[in-house]
Amino acid sequence: MAQTLQEFTHALEEKHLPRVLHIQSGIYYQGCVYEVFGQECSLSTGDLLKVTEITISRFNALTSSSTEIQLPVEYPGLFKLMADSQPYRSIQEIADSLKIGPQRVAQPVFLSAVDVDLEPGLVLRRRDSFRITAVEWSCGRVHCELLHREPPICFSLSFCQQGPFSECQDHQCYTLKEIADWKIPRGRKRSVVEVKAPAKKNFLFSGLLENVCGELLLTPVYELKAISRLSEKVLLIPSNLDVEVVDVTEQYDCDSFVQPLSLMDVYKRPPQFFPVLAKLSSENHFRLSPDLESLFQSKEVIIHHPFKAKRILASEMCQESARHFLIPESYNGRFKRRPRQFSTAYDLERARSETEEIRVVATKDFETVYSGLASVQAGEEFIVTKGQSCAVSHNGTEKVADTFECVKVKAEGKEPVRLPMCLEGGFMELVKDKRQYTIAEICRWFPLPFNVKVSVRDLSLKADILAGTPSLHIEEEISDPCVLVSNTDLSDFREVPVNRTDLIFNVKQRWDGESPKFSVKSAIEEISEDCYYTIRRYAIATITPPPRPPKKPKDPPPRPPKTSRSESTNSESSSCSPKTLHVEPFKQDGLLQCCDSRNGNEQKIPISPVTLPRPSLQKARAKGRSLDDISMDKHAASDNDVHDYEYIDEEQLDNIRRTYQEQQINTKAKPSHTI
C-alpha cells in the first residue's frame, strides 16, 4: 500500500531498519537525482532505495508568542528540558519511544502513578521514582533502579506492565544534538528552556534566539539516510519530500545494495574484519582537521584496526573563554607545576598523594566550635602528609572520617592538627618544585586535577598549540575510540577519532598486508566548548559519588550563656528550622587510624559540603511490603550510627559538579540572552 514519505517516517521504528522502498510517485528535475545543500530534493518513479538510518536534521521551535524559528541541531546553546506532560501508558510504550542505553544521558527517570507488585514482598509504591537502565528485547523486560534508596534497589518490569508512568523533571543541561540523539520520543514534541546562549562571536547562531523569552516547543524534522541501488553514495532525503513509497523489504535482498559504513560502524566491526581497503565517499559533506586533510586527499585508504587511545583532557586557565585540549600520552613537551587552589578541606584530602607532601597557606579564617578540631586563620601554613587516609575506629569498626589530620607550621615548630572536612575556607598551594615533567609522569605521580605550564615545547610538532597557553588545568584521563588509518603506500599513518570525525567509507576488499608494529605519533586536538561539556558530562556520570556529610550531632557543643528570653526564642525557632550540616564533635577517647589509601584497601571519601535544600528523611513504616520497607529494614541495625544520613538526589550532585566545573553557565534565564 502506497503512503507518503512523511507517513512512512513517522510510523517506522529504528529497530526495524534497514527497509527497502519503491518510489511510486516521484518528483524530479533534469534527471534522476538533483541535490540542493547535500539533500536529495527529487526521486524518480521506480527508484529502489535502502533506508539505513533516520536522523533529526533540525527543529522547528515555536515560541510563546507563536513565532516559529528553525534551529539546526548544530546550534551551540545549552537547554534545559521540561518534563513531558503526557504520561506513558505502559512500559512497552516507553521502550518503543525512547532510546535507552548504558550512558546516563540515555537512562530516563519516571514516576509511577500506581502501585506495582514486582515480586513477593516487593511493591513499587505510587509516586516512587525509578530509572530505566537497560532494555532486554529478547525477554520483553526493562531493568530499573529505584531512586532515593541506598544501597540502590534494582528490579525489572515487563513490557506489558501498565502505568501510567510520568517523566520526572531533568535538571541537566543538553545541547540540541544530545536532545536529538537521546531525548526526543518518537511521535512527540519537546518543551525546552535555553539556559546558555551562544557566544557573541558566533555570528552564525548568536542572533537566532536573541529576543526570545520563555519555553520553546521543539518539533523534530527528520531526514532519511538511504542508498540507491545504482549508486555508491549516501542520499540524505528530507522526510517531507512530496513522494509516495511502498515498503518492499520482503521482496528484495538488502545485501544486494552497496553498504557504506560510517566511522562508528567501522569501529564496531569485529577484529577479523580488519585490515580492509576502503574508498572514501566523494559525496560526503564533512569537515576535517588539517592533520587529516592530507591523508584523505587520496580517495582510497587502509583501515588497520580500531582501538581506544588514552587522552588527557586539559583546559586553558584564563579569565575569558578558555580553550580545551585533548593531549596524547606521546606528547614530548615538558611542564612545570603551577599552584593549585583548594576551596575546602575535603579538596585537600582528595589531593593527598603518595609521592609528596602538599604545602598550602590558608586564605580565609575559620573558627571551630568543636573540641579537638583546629581553627584556621588566613596566612597560616599547613602540610598535608603523603599517602595516608584517615579513618576513625569505633568499637573496632572503621567509619568514614569527618576530619583529617595535617600539620600546622609554626615559628617554633610543627604541630599536628585536625581540620573538619566541611571547612569552607580556602587554601593556596605553595609550589617549590622546579622539576620539569612529561604529561605521562604527571598522570602517574599526581592525583588529578593538576595545574601546569608548558616549559619546553614539543619540538617534533610543527606548531605546538599548548606552548602559547598561560597555564593548563589538567582535568582527567579519558579513553577515546579511534581507528588507525593510513594511505595505500603506508607512508602516512593517523589516529582518527571516531566521535569527532564524520566520514563515510565504502569497503572494497580485505587488505592482505601487515599492519605496522610501531607506535603512531598522535596530534594534540583542540575541541569545542560543546564537545568539552559532553566529555565532562559523560565522564562525571561514571564517577562514584563520595559519602554524604554528617548530620547535626546528637550532642551539640556547649553554647555561650543567654538570657532566658532569648533562650526561649531560640528554642522555638530551632524546632521548626531546617536541618543544617554540622561536623560530628571529635571525641578524645576515639582512636584515629591512618590506613594506606593506595594498597587496595577500601577508601571512603566524604563529600565536599555545598549549601543545598535538603529533602526530608523518608520514615520507615512499622510493617509493609514496599521497597521502602525493605530498604529501611536492611539498615535498621545501623540507626545508631553517628552518621545519620539523608538522601541527596543525583540531580543535585550533578548541580554541585556543574557549579565547580561549568562556572560560566548561568542557570537562571535572562530575557536578554536566554528564553
Curated annotation (Swiss-Prot):
The keyword Cytoplasm applies. Residues 253-510 are annotated as: CABIT 2. It is found in: Cytoplasm; Nucleus. Pfam families: CABIT. It comes from the Eukaryota. Residues 566-577 have a biased composition (Low complexity). Residues 1-252 are annotated as: CABIT 1. The keyword Transmembrane does not apply. One of its GO terms (cellular component) is nucleus. Residues 543-582, 594-643 are annotated as: Disordered. Its main location: cytoplasm. GO terms for biological process: adaptive immune response; negative T cell selection; positive T cell selection; T cell receptor signaling pathway. Residues 625-643 have a biased composition (Basic and acidic residues). Keywords: Adaptive immunity, Cytoplasm, Developmental protein, Immunity, Nucleus. PANTHER family: CABIT DOMAIN-CONTAINING PROTEIN, PROTEIN THEMIS. Plays a central role in late thymocyte development by controlling both positive and negative T-cell selection. Required to sustain and/or integrate signals required for proper lineage commitment and maturation of T-cells. Regulates T-cell development through T-cell antigen receptor (TCR) signaling and in particular through the regulation of calcium influx and phosphorylation of Erk. Belongs to the themis family. This is Protein THEMIS.
